[in-house]
Design a protein with these regions (language model features):
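Hydrophobic residues within alpha-helical transmembrane segments
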Residues: 10-13, 58, 89, 93, ...
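Transmembrane helix-loop junctions in multipass membrane proteins, especially transporters and channels
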Residues: 27-31, 80, 107, 111, ...
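Short membrane-interface loop/juxtamembrane segments of multi-pass integral membrane proteins
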Residues: 40-61
Length: 135
């Protein structure tokens, strides 16, 4: 696989990892009778701050997947992955780092770092979009 497809697969897999983690914790909460099976909200607002951050980190991935994943797939399908390959791993690293920071803290420094990671992703996405239109 080329770097673009590896990054796309990594993005999808990372999103899946966050989902599996969230559902494993939810399953444990139900099994231990800490929360009833129908006692969950989509944003985990009735659970711990970590679970709320996990729900948001997963949602961030799902929200970004059609945009950034779409650009990667367009590049591959159009035979233009030379546009996306050079920055594909940087994109994936910024995505994963954003999620990890999101999970770890909500301090001002963490939010700033998280935003910086997202800014890197947006910059790469805009660059890819422009280059794909011009290619």
């Amino acid at each position: 696989m080329n770097p673009t497809l590896v990054a796309f697969a990594g993005f999808v897999s990372w999103s899946l990892c966050l989902l599996v983690l969230m559902e494993a914790i939810r399953t444990n909460l139900v099994a231990t009778k800490a929360v009833s099976a129908n006692g969950f909200t989509p944003d985990n607002s009735n659970l711990s701050p970590f679970m709320q951050r996990l729900a948001r980190a997963h949602a961030n991935c799902v929200e970004g997947l059609p945009i950034f994943g779409g650009l990667m797939l367009i590049a591959v399908v159009a035979g233009k992955s030379a546009v996306t390959d050079p920055l594909a791993y940087y994109f994936l690293a910024a995505r994963i780092l954003q999620s990890l920071v999101h999970l770890s803290s909500v301090t001002a420094m963490a939010v700033t770092l998280r935003f910086a990671c997202f800014t890197v992703q947006m910059g790469i996405g805009v660059y890819w979009a422009v280059r794909l239109f011009l290619a």
